[in-house]
A protein has these predicted regions:
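Multi-pass membrane proteins that catalyze or facilitate reactions on polyprenyl-/lipid-phosphate substrates
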Residues: 1-180
Length: 180
């Protein structure tokens, strides 16, 4: 099952997200407190810029997700978990690490996007659960579903557009944007 590229991607998304979930739950409170600290957010953007800069200058590898080891997958999950802090890009950290592991740029981008989907869905469910448990919600279910649908469609469009552009350009522009 885990010998094909798709099987390896499934394992990456499953096993790689275990440390992410643990770090996300453990550091949630601290991350929420740091979100109001402009210096902490700025440091997060600086970290993102450095990772993108490194990813942009490293020679592209030839490996595929099939070549990832268990340790590399767990390290990807830990890196992704560090993105709970404000300003730190989950995508940039995972992308840079995959490129450092010798993955092709195309497979690195695909893995980085796919790896964050379960985390984002889990965070969404976690947040909605908190929202409803507080009883302070004044939005109808229909309005919320429409917002979710619109957000999902917009996200798919933006991800697709970003993936097309990122194949053609370097990460330098976004790295500079993060610094500014």
């Amino acid at each position: 099952l885990f010998t094909s590229n798709y099987g390896r991607l499934a394992m990456l998304c499953t096993v790689g997200n275990i440390p992410t979930v643990i770090l996300g739950i453990f550091f949630r409170q601290l991350a929420e407190e740091l979100a109001t600290n402009i210096l902490a957010v700025g440091m997060g953007f600086l970290i993102t810029a450095i990772f993108l800069l490194v990813a942009g200058v490293i020679q592209q590898g030839t490996k595929t997700p099939q070549d990832l080891t268990w340790w590399q997958i767990l390290l990807l999950g830990i890196c992704q978990g560090c993105a709970v802090f404000p300003g730190v890009s989950r995508f940039a950290l995972v992308l840079c690490l995959l490129i450092l592991f010798g993955q092709t740029q195309k497979s690195s981008i695909r893995c980085a996007v796919l790896m964050q989907v379960p985390v984002l869905l889990g965070a969404f469910v976690y947040t909605v659960r908190d929202l409803f448990s507080n009883g302070n919600i004044a939005v109808t279910a229909v309005a919320m579903l429409l917002c979710i649908l619109l957000s999902a469609l917009t996200s798919c469009f933006l991800i697709r557009t970003m993936l097309k552009r990122i194949h053609k350009r370097s990460f330098l522009g976004f790295s500079l944007y993060c610094v500014l």
